[in-house]
Amino acid sequence: IQKAKSRGAKIKYIFQTHFHADFVSGHLTLSKMTDAPIIYGPNAKPDYKCIIAADGEFFEIGKIKIKVLHTPGHTLESCSYLLYNENNEPHAIFTGDTLFLGDVGIPDVAQRYKDTTKEELASILYDSINTKIKPLVDNLIVYPGHGAGSACGRNMMKETVDTLKNQKVNNYALNGKFNKEDFVKELTENLPEPPAYFPLNVRLNQTGYMDFDTVLENSMKKINSDEFKELIKNPQIVILDTRSSKDFIKSHIKDSIFIGLEGRFA
């Protein structure tokens, strides 16, 4: 919001590629603060007001426009957004968790589809990539939803932006290395169980959540040392240490859990 104001711009739409599992996206709070509608692609069934776009639908933003590409596979509602410049030429694509740099999004088992197996999701993803993304122009700029370190993929490149031309060479999903059968096997073999909080995040992103400001207001309250000592007598209390790993190693409170927030988020 601050960046938009500094540039004299208005946030017109909030585009969601899918129901995220690894974080709460903040889309509802942003929509409330800006009056911008939330956009999802086909198959999304949120419990709040939004626009469910059709595959191929365009949204105009000033002199540019964005085309919705339904690219299921990571999830059934996953989509990518193709940006056209002022000359009506494809300029960039925002691929969410469908296509990463050097990798693709693994089937999102956190959503636990009743009628769709991980193998079927991988097969659908193969079709999405080969029919919707691979045919696009080589000079297209690719902006994926994650960089290296995310649990939504396995072998992502450390870079966060690339051209589709480079990905057609360096990404196994685009360079013809695998046929569909081998692709499905590669993507689903030894697939790890998702972190325990993933299904909760999916539900929050789909059904709604408490505003972040309210969460902070309720949670970020100072306590003195005596109050702290009393609180930790309760076995249900969990202590999270968010300092650097260096500081945690030097000393930490007994039984505290290290989750250092050092500015690097995948």
Indicate residue ranges for each PLM-predicted region.
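Conserved beta-strand elements of the Class I
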Residues: 67, 93, 238-240
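Short, charged, surface-exposed secondary-structure boundary motifs
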Residues: 47-51, 103-104, 266
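Metallo-beta-lactamase
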Residues: 65, 75-193
